[in-house]
Regions:
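Membrane-interface helix-loop junctions in multi-pass transporters/channels
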Residues: 1-146
Length: 146
């Protein structure tokens, strides 16, 4: 009976550590997202959602790269906690598809149909291109000797 209680306690501990890792990754990603948006607005202005485009493209690259480099055939071993910290926590906190949707709606409400269409088109193509690029780069690294 004591062994069963110990195993149940260990399972709860493991879950708490995993949730903590995801939460910490989300905090770090969220802070970097906010800083990126502020920086993009300062550099490029506020007429187009540059910050959101940047974080979603960068996050797509990171998740494509990390999922491949740390996957079953990857060169880097990463346990579940680390993978969840990076992919669910950090990338989830860093990217912001809800803000993308809101910014697109605001462009439409301002009757900026070309801007909204450009935001949607460029974003989707860039996200897919970035995740593909990250995956491709990590796949090549995985095949290197050594």
């Amino acid at each position: 009976m004591a062994a069963a209680r110990k195993a149940a306690w260990r399972e709860k501990q493991d879950a708490a550590i995993l949730y903590g890792a995801v939460g910490l990754g989300a905090v770090i990603g969220g802070v970097l997202r906010a800083l990126s948006s502020i920086g993009a607005a300062a550099l490029l202005g506020t007429g187009f959602p540059w910050g959101t485009l940047f974080v979603n493209v960068a996050g797509s690259f990171v998740i494509g790269f990390y999922a491949t480099i740390s996957g079953p055939d990857g060169r880097i071993f990463a346990g579940t906690r680390v993978r969840q910290f990076v992919m669910t926590g950090f990338c989830g906190g860093f990217t912001t598809f809800s803000v993308f949707s809101l910014e697109t709606l605001r462009l439409l409400q301002a009757a900026n149909i070309p801007g909204a269409a450009l935001n949607i088109g460029v974003s989707v193509v860039a996200w897919l291109g970035a995740v593909w690029l990250g995956h491709t780069l990590a796949s090549r690294i995985n095949r290197l000797g050594g």
